[in-house]
């Protein structure tokens, strides 16, 4: 009796937890794609409004939207990519890390694919908040046209408040994200259901033949409107990127039970409304609702777009942390805003970069119609990159043959390339903005990676082999350095070479500690490393120990905490009797270098932007000794 009751209680708790994950996924994962109905159909109709929209065009466009959602979101992301995880983590960099683990790090195609995908995502993280919030506030123009001039400043004010709040964390309000977004999807579904009966011909859009027929007869205009049709799936990358936060089943359940049906009903309702009232093509989303409901819907839409923006910002923070740990960016200051959830982080430099970009976009474009033309390129580009990485995943991880992997993904790849081509037609109309943003970010990441590789090669060639140094220093002679009590830890990224900071300490202080640790921190190509694989201790001589500490690319690189695990490995030391020796690099430009002059200057600027290793690795500040060294590049 008691056992049965306990089992039932556990089942209820398990179901409650699962429902909570589903609701949370709706708020975070689907916030972006859930705001697309605000503008997607309106923008797709725009090329046809001058001559009046016709049944063939409305049904064809809605059919394209339905099947774009079905093929790209349902088949590619929900059913396939959510299974292509790296120990439960998803996203472009996570998939890249898994492939590097399987195929090696020195695969240029993989490396540049990861850089491009990451850069495109950051560009998308600037455009999404600006476009979605302006689209929501523009519903106020239907209440009174006088609101039109206030949309940009109101949007900017909301963005400033949102970005300013990031440093305090979102834990206090995130519990409301899911319920508010659920309400938003119900409101969208209700708006669609009310109007589908306006013209039942819209149900013909369910037949994919109508989508193909539209493309066959629309000619060049058909390719142009594909760029707007693609707006229906912006935000799909979030499904994959947030896999680690919610898990595969809750994300899939949320899509099939609420999100997908609500989107289909809303788009069908917008189409039926325009078929029955062609003038509604000016703003079909908000015109679906009666006058008395317009203000509440605008307010709910604004909340939904703020939540969608928050999800994109959080994703950008997470991507930046992964990029830092994988060596694509310099050490950035990362603050944890929750004591219990390590996924809730704040990256001040990324926050400032995004806010600056968002405000520039709001005031440069002025309205969502203009900004929508710039949208899509970054998203389609990121999706094409993900499909390319997924092809390698099928071959390297799942063992598919080239022909089988091609058969699985080539049709999808062709569809996405067509969408990318359609979006590239908008380059002159503002599409250059996300391209320029992505190129700038990619250049920074490539320069940092190339510069770090060059410095490591330089050190490997110029520094003394560690084993030779230890043999010479352990020989007893009249010139041997004085031995002092305690432990000295020397951080280095090239563990088989003698750290310069160790040589400088000997040269200037003429002492050697009783215990000397050559410490190297490694980032593995997996999200998390368990404690039993965290450290590796190698005794090199009576006074020298090599210590390797391994972190995953989603781990907090807390070296002090990791050192506490050394006791379990038989290596004992007292933290208050330990000194951490760090080398502070001062880069000096030289004529002969492995980097072009422009890249040298960028790399030196990035080097100056990086935070101190003592802060990044959470070393006790009162136990850190820094010695300067000049490095010629």
From Swiss-Prot:
Its main location: membrane. It comes from the Bacteria. Pfam families: K_trans, K_trans_C. The keyword Transmembrane applies. It catalyses: K(+)(in) + H(+)(in) = K(+)(out) + H(+)(out). Coiled coil: none annotated. GO terms for molecular function: potassium ion transmembrane transporter activity; symporter activity. It is found in: Cell inner membrane. The chain crosses the membrane at residues 18-38, 61-81, 107-127, 143-163, 176-196, 211-231, 255-275, 293-313, 345-365, 371-391, 402-422, 429-449. InterPro entries: K+_transporter, K_trans_C, K_trans_N, Kup. Keywords: Cell inner membrane, Cell membrane, Ion transport, Membrane, Potassium, Potassium transport, Symport, Transmembrane, Transmembrane helix, Transport. It is a multi-pass membrane protein. Transport of potassium into the cell. Likely operates as a K(+):H(+) symporter. Belongs to the HAK/KUP transporter (TC 2.A.72) family. PANTHER family: LOW AFFINITY POTASSIUM TRANSPORT SYSTEM PROTEIN KUP (PTHR30540:SF79), OSMOTIC STRESS POTASSIUM TRANSPORTER (PTHR30540). This is Probable potassium transport system protein Kup 2. The gene is kup2.
